[in-house]
Regions:
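N-terminal cap/leader regions of alpha/beta-hydrolase-fold enzymes
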Residues: 1-247
Length: 247
């Protein structure tokens, strides 16, 4: 499927938020497509995130991928996959308030709903920090499904300065369906943390699918030594199955 790529600057209380838009090219008819709010890792719109966005758009989705650190960096800033970029991304993660993350999600959800190619049915997807933010986006009633890949800090951590402790506690408020995908060799979400997340979702009565690969953190990032192309292919297929079923 041919896609178009561009961006919009969405207004937020903390300034304009550059949001990258990928959508199927306009057909000759009046086709409309589901929308996806896509969250990146802590590095913003890197090459792997752009390619993931393009893949999803090519499967028939209007994808909006916001620059989550818009209040800290100018539009278009991409952090490097190195120690300096990692340190900066983690610092911004801690400095951004939970209210900002949640409000920004609502802004993108409204923009998706207003996009002329979107049919109004909206899901969320994210990797790493973005997996956590996709989970939180599902707390908003418009989000019908969320695919969360190796979501960090769900079990408690430094997101928003350590104020993320209510994410799992609010799982009962999620009325859509979740997909949670993990790597068993992920040091950021070890066995005990994954077990705690699973038990919390069961206790909350959440509708979810759970899949673990023998893979590292960031195994879907299609550059670098941790990339596992076969696991990434299967994981993306799980997400597409979720969205086809729910959106």
């Amino acid at each position: 499927m041919i896609i178009h790529a561009g961006f919009v600057d969405l207004d937020t209380p903390t300034g304009p938020m550059r949001t990258h838009v990928y959508a199927p090219a306009p057909p000759t008819g009046t086709a409309r497509y589901p929308g996806l709010l896509l969250y990146p890792e802590i590095y913003q719109q890197t090459g792997p995130i752009v390619r993931l966005s393009q893949q999803l758009a090519g499967h028939g989705y209007v994808v909006m991928a916001p620059e989550i650190y818009h209040e800290h960096e100018p539009p278009g800033t991409v952090l490097a996959y190195d120690k300096a970029g990692t340190d900066k991304g983690n610092a911004y993660k801690a400095a951004t308030t939970l209210a900002t993350f949640d409000h920004d999600a609502a802004v993108v959800i409204r923009a998706l709903g207003a996009h002329p190619a979107c049919n109004g049915r909206i899901g969320a997807v994210g990797v790493c920090l973005g997996g956590h933010l996709a989970f939180r986006a599902a707390l908003q009633s418009q989000v019908l499904a969320a695919a969360c890949f190796y979501a960090t800090d769900l079990q408690g951590g430094i997101l928003a300065g350590g104020t993320c402790v209510d994410t799992l506690a609010r799982a009962r408020d999620i009325h859509g369906e979740l997909l949670l995908v993990w790597g068993r060799q992920d040091p950021h979400v070890p066995d005990g943390a994954r077990a705690g997340i699973y038990q919390a979702l069961v206790a909350a009565g959440t509708t979810f699918t759970w899949h673990e690969f023998n893979a590292q953190h960031a195994f879907m990032r299609d550059e670098g030594p941790r990339y596992d192309p076969e696991a990434a292919r299967i994981a993306l297929g799980l997400a597409l199955s979720l969205f086809q079923r729910t959106l």
